Regions:
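GH16 jelly-roll
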Residues: 19-180, 186-189, 195-275
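Fungal secretory targeting signals
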Residues: 1-26
């Protein structure tokens, strides 16, 4: 991961909870334009317990026109009607470290729960879960047959995706589990309940792609892959069309814990090094 020409250590800016328009998208892509510096996480460790929140935390941003509720169950992301896509993301970026998310996925055919690291240059490292196992049968699957989808994007291009299967008793829509991503300039690891389920080394990056190497936010949310208005293939991937009579379908996040490998105050792109 390039160190020079990417990080500018400036002053930390206060960011309050706010509502932004749409899904998480860059307001400025530094590969295409000169962009303002972005807030970084200045501390080595960060932890938030959503079960103790009663309103949006000041360092998280909630998508405009969507609702995320905070109760004793944690942050609640409810798919209640066609087009719902409640999500929120950190108001700060990181350039490497470990992210631990304690969550319970939303049930429901075609309902997608996600936890993703996402950058302004459209690098992405994610988890995606289908409430009905992406349409696989029989459902619910036997122990050892639950699949979790993990994906990697580099500058908006998907270069790796795979399903990992849980070997133990695993009921993700009924139980809370800890899902973790560890990422730096050398590797990416995905964990479930502190067990490595997948690993990628930077040296194995395929030709024509770059290893994710830009500061990222953490985004959490649920959306309707099986929305009736979606394309046939999107609905097929998600596990089929959503039964709206069974809504709402809710994903819960109890807590987020972060270990920050490179504490900083702000990130600045001094050139378009990633092009």
């Amino acid at each position: 991961m390039p160190k020079g020409g990417i990080i500018g250590l400036l002053t930390t800016l206060a960011v309050t909870a706010q509502f932004a328009s749409g899904q998480l998208e860059p307001d400025c892509n530094p590969l295409k334009a000169d962009c303002q510096p972005k807030k970084a996480l200045p501390n080595e460790n960060y932890y938030i317990d959503f079960t103790k929140q009663t309103s949006p935390p000041q360092d998280w941003i909630i998508a405009n026109d969507e609702a995320v509720n905070f109760t004793s169950n944690g942050a609640e992301f409810a798919y209640a009607k066609e087009g719902d896509a409640p999500s929120m993301w950190t108001g700060f970026y990181m350039l490497g470290g470990r992210y631990d998310i304690e969550m319970k996925i939303a049930p429901g055919q075609g309902v997608i729960s996600s936890a993703a690291l996402w950058s302004d240059t459209q690098d992405e490292i994610d988890y995606e879960f289908s409430g009905n196992q992406f349409g696989q049968t029989p459902f619910p699957p036997q122990d050892g047959m639950w699949a979790i989808e993990t994906n990697v994007f580099a500058q908006g291009k998907m270069w790796d995706g795979a399903a990992t299967y849980q070997k133990d008793s695993y009921k993700p829509a009924e139980q809370f589990h800890k899902y973790s991503v560890e990422w730096d300039e050398d590797h990416m690891n995905w964990y479930v309940d502190d067990k490595v389920v997948r690993s990628i080394q930077a040296k194995d990056t395929p030709s024509g792609f770059t290893f994710p190497q830009s500061p990222m936010k953490l985004q959490l949310g649920v959306w309707g892959g099986g929305d009736p208005s979606n394309s046939y293939w999107t609905k097929q991937w998600a596990g089929g069309e959503i039964d709206l009579t069974g809504a709402p379908y809710t994903m819960y996040v109890k807590s987020v814990s972060i270990t920050n490998k490179y504490p900083a105050c702000q990130y600045r792109y001094n050139d378009k090094w990633a092009k």
